[in-house]
Amino acid sequence: MAHTVQTLSKLLKKTPDEVVTILANAGVDGKNSDSVISAEERKILMSSLSKRPIRRSSMSVFRKAGTKSNAVSVSDVKVKVRSKRLTQPITMIDEQSKVVANEMARAALAALDAGRNADEILLAQDARRLEMVRLQKAQVEVVEIQKETVKKVQEKEAEKKVEKLKTADKPKEGNKPKRLRNTSSDNNTRKQLHVARHNPNRRLKKKDRTHLSQKIQAEQAQHAFQKPIEKVIHEVAIVGNIKVTELAQKMATKAGEVLKVLMGMGVMVTLNDVIDQDTALLVVEEMGHKGIISVEETIEDVLIEQLKYNEHESARPPIVTIMGHVDHGKTSLLDYIRQAKVAHGEVGGITQHIGAYQVQSNGNIITFIDTPGHAAFSKMRFRGANVTDIVILVVAADDGVMPQTIESIKHTQIVGVPMIVAINKIDKEGTDVDKIKQVLSTYDVISEDWGGDVIMVPVSAHTGEGVDALLDAISLTAEILEFSAVSEGPAHGTVLEARLEKGRGKVTTILVQSGTLNKGDIMIAGFEYGKVKQIVDDKGKILKLAMPSMPVEVLGLSGVPNSGDEVIVVGSERKAREVADFRKSKDREVQLQKQQASKMENFLMKMEKGDISTVNVLLKADVRGSAQALIEALEELSTDEVRVKVVSSGVGGINNTDITLAATSSALVLGFNVRADAVARKTADNEGVRVEYYSIIYNLINDVKAIMSGLLSPELSENIIGIASVKNIFKSQKMGDIAGCMVDEGMVKRDSLIRVLRDSVVIFDGKLESLRRFKDDVNEVKSGTECGIGVLNYTDVQPGDQIEIFERVERARIL
């Protein structure tokens, strides 16, 4: 096989130009990288590679080491130690590498002539090269060991020389002078003899300078404590609310430093106070660490994970919520659909709690939820929108779009449920349906007639006109959306309403959203738990179970839960108690944190504006939803000068304990659809506690507003009653300067407040001291009359000035 210069250069580990140069030096000219090399020319190339240049440095394998001297000082004697002459090998790595490379190239050519494959030759070369590198490393290590050995020998010889010198300097035993205990040239002084403890003849240990000792010292220095140069950044995991001390411990810092940061942020707390997760994250970032929001798996989470549901879902009735402004006919429309008279039973003709009913229309079951329209029941409407599938927005054709109508639209858009607009009261004269559609379109509620996606149905709750069309629209929407839920397994739902009822106890209205609620199930609702003793539907019929989309009344809970609380059925009462206790403990932490924040806020407000007037209120209502709505409405009445504080609230009648608490806290007792018992009434009379009863929510709110208005400081206003021009100044020994004036407008009264104006600028604000007409003192002077005015504590009145006479009037302020 013919080989080119290029091929041979790869085998020889040389460039093609180097191969061409070697051939030219051997007498083979005219070659380039692509030229073919014959067998004869390869032999010439092999012969050229075998000729190695002889250099003097390569002939001497060993040379004598140079002489090294170590100087050692012992007291005043300096000793110079000359080490032995040793021989050590000198490795000529570069020259040997060249020799080995030439030998490998020559071997490659020989193998090529023998007919071996070029790839095999390359592999053999790589193996031999690796072996050569290994041998070179071993040879270098041998040299280092030899150097180390020479160094140790030199150090030992130096130590021996020093030992001999020390021995020579010691005096002999016979010539050793006697040491007397107290002999001295001065009798008053005493010589002290310092000897080594335990062993007087012991020499001080010399510092070990061996290689091993130095290595150990280096390792000890490496592992010794070093003050950190850079600040350590911690990753701090924050799970919910956290104590200040615990947060400081996680950041490995002092709690006082954390308090300083919190004070800088305007948060006034102590070491044992609890701060919320957001505040803790800000503190961590402010102190240069990295905050991580961590979610701790609680007992509640574990319990919910253990609940097993059947994955098979079946069709369920749609849940429809009726929303809108107060007095727009929501309950009346639902009454017509149910063929009932609920609206007549509502006090004041307005709904004040959530009502839930099931209606059968054309063979289809529909669940209706009626919500209050009054402004105070905003949270109730939002709860209704959260649990619903379809919203019926009722708009009165005569009133049009009102504030609660707009609020209901926003609630629906936030939740993202379909909406059907029922334009009610079309039986009245002068109604304009198109105008209502136009106003609704400004809130992105566009009718299908106008190219939108919202069904709008004109109806009349009085005559029943359009009600069937409304029910058909509901059924059509439900059919399109195909509402379904898991019907087997533990029940899951929401508390719509809760109350205390005489003879029945705690009654909770819930809406089952999935699963099946059976009599005897263990149920958790908010902070309350218990065994389901009785299930009653909206018609008063006792049931054994409740399916999805059914609103039912349940008896058996330990207390009255809040409206909107989640309802879960669990396996045992013990687990239910654990979850309820866990929720109560978390709620206590939140309430404590709110109280701390409120105390600090009140303290700061008092520092800025003085004391704030407070109206203390103790509230009792018939149902939990009404109590929650009233608390929110009353707290919204608070201003910077006067605020409402609900010291206690509850569900049920007013008892003696409530009156005692009200007397202690100087609170006004408000009963909404409840009354005080005989004992409570007697205690209230004895303690002087004011008790008020209400059945309409806005009457209660208006009365509290009036009480708050009475605590407001009066508003001061100024009424200008006259203006007089100064014509001349008269001197009086008794009265001082008297301004002779002409009354231009109104009148001037004795003892009135005045202002002196010069060039329309107020230069003095004071009181009128004297008023005379000629030489007589008068009480008042009317317009167009001259008079003399004496100004109290002011003598700089000049002709041309104006005197403005005014009075301050206090006016009661109203919220």
UniProtKB/Swiss-Prot annotation:
Sequence segments annotated as region (Disordered): 153-219
Region (G2): 349-353
Residues covered by region (G4): 424-427
Disulfide bonds: none
Subcellular location: Cytoplasm
Entry annotated with the keyword Signal: no
Start and end residues of each stretch annotated as G1: 324-331
CDD domains in the record: IF2_eIF5B, IF2_mtIF2_II, mtIF2_IVc
GO cellular component: cytosol
Major localization class: cytoplasm
Source domain of life: Bacteria
Domain tr-type G as annotated: residue spans: 315-482
Binding site for GTP: 324-331, 370-374, 424-427
Region of interest (G5), residue spans: 460-462
InterPro entries noted in UniProt: EF-G-like_DII (IPR053905), IF2_II (IPR044145), IF2_N (IPR006847), P-loop_NTPase (IPR027417), Small_GTP-bd (IPR005225), T_Tr_GTP-bd_dom (IPR000795), TF_IF2_bacterial-like (IPR000178), TIF_IF2 (IPR015760)
Basic and acidic residues bias (residue ranges): 153-176
Keyword terms: Cytoplasm, GTP-binding, Initiation factor, Nucleotide-binding, Protein biosynthesis
Chain intervals with Basic residues compositional bias: 191-209
Role summary: One of the essential components for the initiation of protein synthesis. Protects formylmethionyl-tRNA from spontaneous hydrolysis and promotes its binding to the 30S ribosomal subunits. Also involved in the hydrolysis of GTP during the formation of the 70S ribosomal complex.
Similarity comment text for this entry: Belongs to the TRAFAC class translation factor GTPase superfamily. Classic translation factor GTPase family. IF-2 subfamily.
Name recorded for this polypeptide: Translation initiation factor IF-2
Species annotation: Vesicomyosocius okutanii subsp. Calyptogena okutanii (strain HA)
